Amino acid sequence: MAKTLYEKLFDAHVVYEAENETPLLYIDRHLVHEVTSPQAFDGLRTHGRPVRQPGKTFATMDHNVSTQTKDINACGEMARIQMQELIKNCKEFGVELYDLNHPYQGIVHVMGPEQGVTLPGMTIVCGDSHTATHGAFGALAFGIGTSEVEHVLATQTLKQGRAKTMKIEVQGKAAPGITAKDIVLAIIGKTGSAGGTGHVVEFCGEAIRDLSMEGRMTLCNMAIEMGAKAGLVAPDETTFNYVKGRLHAPKGKDFDDAVAYWKTLQTDEGATFDTVVTLQAEEISPQVTWGTNPGQVISVNDNIPDPASFADPVERASAEKALAYMGLKPGIPLTEVAIDKVFIGSCTNSRIEDLRAAAEIAKGRKVAPGVQALVVPGSGPVKAQAEAEGLDKIFIEAGFEWRLPGCSMCLAMNNDRLNPGERCASTSNRNFEGRQGRGGRTHLVSPAMAAAAAVTGHFADIRNIK
C-alpha cells in the first residue's frame, strides 16, 4: 500500500500497538532546555529512575538566558533557578549540556540541526512547541509537555495517536527576494491559524525544493502556527549535503548507508492525503502580519483590512479585536505603519542565511531615529560565523545591537521584551497579545523585511530598497 512520508516515519517507530490502544513510539532524539525540564527530572529522582538513553538526550540553555551577558543571574530569580537546575540535572543524569559557556550553546532548534543531532528518518521531541522545525530534515518532530518529557527521559518512548495527513504544495518558482518566511506566512494566511489542526503537514513543490535547509527549517518551524502537529519536507541532496560532516552525523560508510535509507523517505506515488492545499509561488509577495495570530497577514503593499470585509462573523470579531489591540485603523497602507523596535532572531530566523539577508539591507544604512533594533544569533557557531564574515560590524555600524545567542525577544521570558504599546517588526513566529511583552504589538516578517523596517522606521517593501 502506498504511504505518505509521515506514515512511513510513524510506522517505522511503532514499538507496540494493541487493539484500541494508542501506539507506543520509539524516540530517537530528545532535546531538553531549562524551562520545561526541571519537574521532569524531579519525577525521575522521586521514582529512582535513570535517564534511559542519555546518549540520545541533548540539553541547552536558551529560553530565559540574557543576550547581553553570560551571567545566569542576569534575568531574575526564576531564570537563575531553572538554569541551575538544568546544570545539576544534566550532571546527575549524565546528559550532555551546552551551557552558557559552551561554544555550541544556542536555541535548541538551531543547535540540534547544526550539530548533526537532527537527522532524516528520526523521531525527535522537545518540551517546546516549535520542535516541528526539525521536520525540515524529513524527521517526525513535535513538541511535548513536561509529563511527556519525563516519560521520554525514563523510557525513550512515547504514546502517540496517528494524525491526519495534509499536503501543501507550493508550485512554481518564488520571485527574487521572497523567502521561506514569506512563503509560510502566505500559507498560513490561506489555511488560517487552525487550518492544520489534527494534521501532520508535508510541504512540497518546486518552490519548496528550491529552499536551502535553513529556509526549510523556517517553513517547518511555523507548521505549528497553522495548528499542525508537525511539518515535514522529504530529504534530498540538499539535506544530505547539509548533514554531511556534522558532529553527530554518521561518518564514512555509515553515512553512505544512511543516505541510501534516507532516499526511501519520500511519499509514495499514489499515496493519498486527507487534505491538499496548493499555492502558486509567483503570487507570493513580502508578507507582514497585521493582527494577533499568524493567519492575519497581508502583502506589505496592501492596506490594513476592514473587519467588515470578513464574511465569517467569528473572523470579523477576531479582526475587530486584533485591530483594537494593535492600534491600527482599517484602510491605512501597511507601509505607513511606524515601528518602535526590531527583533531579528528566534528559532524561526536566526541562522547565518537569515543574518546575511538582514545585513544586506542594513549595509551602508542607519537605524531610523527612535528605533531600537536587536540582532540575536541563534547559537554560538552562528555568532562566530557571522563575525568571521563581518556581519556584526555591518549591524553595529548601522546602529543595530549585536547580542549573545538565546530566544531573546521572541517571548517575554527574559530581559528582551516590548513595553506596553510598543510596535515591533519581528522575525519570530508568534504575534499573540503579550507574546513579546505585556501590551506589545508584534508584526511577523522575514529578516530582510525586519532590517528594512529598522532603517526606514516603518514597514517597507525590500524590493524597492535594494
UniProtKB/Swiss-Prot annotation:
**NCBIfam families from the UniProt entry:** leuC, PRK05478.1, PRK12466.1
What protein am I looking at? 3-isopropylmalate dehydratase large subunit
According to the UniProt entry, what is the EC number of this protein?
4.2.1.33
Q: What keywords tag this UniProt record?
A: 4Fe-4S, Amino-acid biosynthesis, Branched-chain amino acid biosynthesis, Iron, Iron-sulfur, Leucine biosynthesis, Lyase, Metal-binding
Name the family: Belongs to the aconitase/IPM isomerase family. LeuC type 1 subfamily.
Q: Which reaction does it catalyse?
A: (2R,3S)-3-isopropylmalate = (2S)-2-isopropylmalate
Task: Identify which cofactors the protein needs according to its UniProt entry.
Answer: [4Fe-4S] cluster
Q: Which HAMAP family match?
A: LeuC_type1
**Single biological process term from Gene Ontology:** L-leucine biosynthetic process
Query: Quaternary form?
Result: Heterodimer of LeuC and LeuD.
Q: What does this protein do?
A: Catalyzes the isomerization between 2-isopropylmalate and 3-isopropylmalate, via the formation of 2-isopropylmaleate.
Chain positions recorded as [4Fe-4S] cluster binding sites: 347, 407, 410
Cofactor comment in the record?
Binds 1 [4Fe-4S] cluster per subunit.
Q: Which Pfam families match?
A: Aconitase (PF00330)
Q: Which pathway is this protein engaged in?
A: Amino-acid biosynthesis; L-leucine biosynthesis; L-leucine from 3-methyl-2-oxobutanoate: step 2/4
> Could you tell me the gene encoding this protein?
leuC
Instruction: Tell me the GO molecular function terms.
Output: 3-isopropylmalate dehydratase activity; 4 iron, 4 sulfur cluster binding; metal ion binding
